[in-house]
Amino acid sequence: MTLLNKSIRYYVDFDQWGINAFNSNPIETTKGFNEALIYASENNFPIVEVPKGNFIIDSVNTLNQRNPEIGGGIKIPSNMELLLDPEAVFQVNPNGYQGYSCFYIGLAENVIIRGGRIIGDRYQHDYSLIDTDRKTHEWGFGIHVHGSKNVLIENVQISDCIGDNIWIAAHGMMNYPGMVYTPSKSVTVRKCELKRGRRNNLATNGCEGLLVEDCDIEEAGGDTIGPQLGIDLEGYGENGRKYDHPYELTISDCRFRKNGRGSVTAHTSGKVSIKDNYCDNVISYGYSTDVSIKGNKIINEGGSKEYGIDSVGVSSTETGNRIQITDNNIQGFKIGMMIRGKGVSIDNNTVKNASNCAIATHMAEDVSISNNRIQDSDCIQIQVRNSSDIKVSNNKGKGTTSAYAIKVMDSNDVKFLNNTFSNLYGGLYCERSQAVRIKLNDFLLSGKGYGIYWDKDSEVFLTRNEIFEPRNVAIMGAADMYNIRISDNQIYNCKAIIAIHLIGGSEHMVRGNEIMFNRDSDQGYGIYLNGTKKVRLIRNDVQGIGARVLSHPFATFNASSTTLIHNTYDSGTPRLALDDTVIDYK
């Protein structure tokens, strides 16, 4: 070591400062560490080294009865790098207070803490003392960053705190009368191991510029309090006003395992990047804005879990979410992705082994779902519910024994374009939804469901879809409420008795459809109208394969005032109503 290196490093002498390195004398030990750090700071030592030892830390600030975590434990001053030996172990002295801080970085700047191990008192804590305002004992922290900036926490092991193992907080609150808001800024947590935080493993309520990377984050929660997350980005606002707002946050290349209620939640935050992490539980964008969830492996190989990616909606302080969900691999959840809120793009993800639904929207608006792959998921592939302005395009899925590939319920302004689904029970099922456009989709059916179905309260437009081997009606609709358009669709190897069946309503257009039957027996109705009025059938073609004979390629006898123009067929005879108009249909 050079003389220059010696001159900038201060080595803590335990005897000089009355520090006990053998698990005793917590008050004297804590006092000694604080005095040593003050001495090093006042004498301009930028680096302080702590040798190995086992230290009991008095982490409670008893002078602050309301918030004993503020100013508790070892207080690190500005402009200091604290190097802890890998075998330096700091144990919180068991106590009964609502909060504590083993290490406290308050209104400081340019602070680094590296190495060492911090252990909370979770399993020795006295939870019996109940304060009228703070009843849950959830404010005990391993490292507490409070209104500080330019902070690096690296290669530290932290476990078993009664609150969060690392808590990164603002000093004060935004938009609160009489209070000055000082967020923490530019905080990095790197290569740390965080385990068994009773509330969360890491959380922030007010940080501008947070990077958490290459950390192992495990086993948060396990008690009655929440949220029990690996990382909780937990801003707060109500009635259109922000009080806490984490901002410009990146969670990257971390490994999340066995965290009680989820891996990462961006509850009410802004400009968040969650990328390239391994998780075994849910990532949620909550109410947040400008969030990117990219390249994560979200793989559940344990028990039943609800969501791979989840959400809540739009915050009262915002007009939308603006979310990007791309390139993720999601496996083993009931629902792969649950999309809520406004302004969400879901692109190029893989969802595997979903059991209830692969991708779902609920109370969502302005959503694009595109280029996703759904594998080994015997369930609804894509569901749109209580949503509007939804586009679903270029997705691919297969393999349902009792579920439709797509379900639409109580929604409007929904477009399905160029999706491919195979080996299906049924294609698309629509209820109580309007302005549903279904175009250029492929449905290869193997079950007894409909190819495309809608109820009497739905408005649909079907264009250029291909339906293969339907065993039930290929296109079926109870069209009472709206005028329906069915054009240029192709139905191949239809094994059902009816290919297109319309019930009720008036002035529908059925144009340019190609229907190919391939039944094991005679009979078959190409287009069957029941209770409709003034429907136009134009240039549709109905064909039977082999020697089987169709009954009636066009059956309008239970309808009225149908107009048939230039329709063609190769077997059977049309069965028409007396008031139909026919123009060269063969």
From Swiss-Prot:
Residue spans of the PbH1 repeats: 108-147, 148-170, 184-206, 207-235, 246-268, 288-313, 320-341, 364-384, 387-410, 411-432, 435-456, 481-504, 505-531
Disulphide connectivity of cysteines: none
InterPro entries given in the database record: Beta_helix, PbH1, Pectin_lyas_fold, Pectin_lyase_fold/virulence, SCF-Subunits/Alg-Epimerases
Domain of life: Bacteria
Keywords noted in UniProt: Repeat
SUPFAM superfamilies: Pectin lyase-like
Pfam families the record matches: Beta_helix
Entry protein name: SPbeta prophage-derived uncharacterized protein YorA
Organism: Bacillus subtilis (strain 168)
Taxonomic placement: Bacteria, Bacillati, Bacillota, Bacilli, Bacillales
